[in-house]
Amino acid sequence: MVSLLLISLILTSCKEWDEHYDAGSAVEGSATATIWENITANSNLSQFAALVQKAGYAELLKSTQTVTVWAPLNDTFDYEALMNESNETLRKEFVQNHIARNNYPASGRVETSISMLNLKHLVFEGNGNYTMDGIAVAQPNVASLNGVLHTINGKLQFRSNILESLNNKDFPIDSISDFVHSYDVLRLNESKSTPGPVVDGQLTYLDSVFDDYNLLCQNYAYINREDSNYSMVVPSNEAWTKAMDYIKKCYNYVNFSYFDKPSSKGTNQTQERVTLSPSPEYWNDSISHDKMLTGLFYNNNLFDNKKLMKWAEGEQPQIDSLMTTWYDRIYTEDAEQMLKATTPVKKSNGVMFVTGDSLHLQPWLFWNPIINVEAEFGSNLAAVENGSDRTERVTAETQNPLVPGSVSNQGYVTVSPNTNMSNVELNFYLRGARSTTYVLYGVFVPANITNRFIPQEDIKPNQVQVQIGMNRANGSLPANPTTLTRTDTIGYDDEGKPITKIVNLFTNDPSKVDTVCFGEITFPICYYGMAGSPYLRVLSRVPVGNTEFDRTVRIDRFFLLPKELDAYMKQHPDYKVHY
């Protein structure tokens, strides 16, 4: 049984806890009325009073809690439209947007960012004449028993944050909106609730305050917080569907069997079984959605992400790289391609970049990445037959300057034969392979990588056969691994058609650190996140008595390039791949 590290998920404030605030003392001044009494006594605030009453906030303005209210005068806003809104919308987007806890008088020079009841941050400023979020104050400082009342010449604009904007209908984004909001939950806030008696061993509450949280925000980005600053790439419904169709094909999970230490001799090999709980379908759905979201969130305060705000304002400064909230990077070409196909929309806590009919993210960036296998890592090497392995180190200082190329991670594995007639076998795990088509490459290291004095006649190529052990589509294991072949073009006929040959034995160029293509391989099932994996078998194929090839094999690494990336790199030779 394999356990999945399921995403831990959390929660944004839902019920007002008004009664938990209390004004320490009445505001000094000659006024003896509450804010509510002052509002209802002013005929120019009758529309605002009616909306406050409808939303259920009159009691707050009558209470001893200290608040400041910016009340729009009659006919300076669309009263009828607001009266037709639901109480929930009216409370959050209008009434709470005009009330703040504590006293905020207009006196002298003022420049204050104020957190309103709905947690939106609005700027109150001026010196003699005052504005609230750009709206002129008509009459400041109507002193009241429980705070301050300012009248203003218009409604304060409600600015949605990114999470709230996933609810609106300005764009066709129902798919991602429905998915994100399916993780909205309520949680009791014990510290803000009033404890009651213990009943049947359980603590009850006289006054329960709940917080509403979105469980995805904890794991990806706090797009629900007003004090945060994020960018979110928001796929349209069409873009979401296209991307999810692609992703789900790459994460085709089934129950399967695998060998823990694969080798042709089966020296220490045992067969194990992976059974997915609760089901393979659950894994396909949950992992696919996770991969879909991974590349959509960016903290605007980090690194070159800061330039996203300039993109939102219509500028397009070059971006060296963007870093997601999962610390994955995408670089200049890919980042700018993604952004240029979007419509930026500024929000109270960042920016939404809404896509058109496609999410212009290259699939190998987040969904179907390169699989890199460092040969010198002991955890990657499953088994060696007919020889012994050792890890070698090479740095820029120790590398032979006459050998072009470089060794990744400053290390490689050397496998030496047991006898001068042995052909060695190396078996490697291909962990994390997706259910997709790859082009497999191997990087060979020459014998003189750190020794420039090795005689030239002793620097020979390897000749190897390459096999892949993988499952069938139903998860069963075939009797034998698949032998890879590569189709090479060796010329052209009189009509210009290519003449090809099939290569099943691969050789390297020993004059350099050489990357060799072994051909394509398609995995029917996905191994991402699994204990078991397919394996790569490299078999030295040097005939008896042959002196042309080296029986000692030196491997830097192997990498599986998604077929689309391999083709893209051939069409765009200047494209930079980071792996």
PLM segments and residue spans:
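Mature, structured domains of secreted/extracytosolic soluble proteins
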Residues: C14-Y579
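Sec-dependent bacterial lipoprotein signal peptides
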Residues: M1-C14
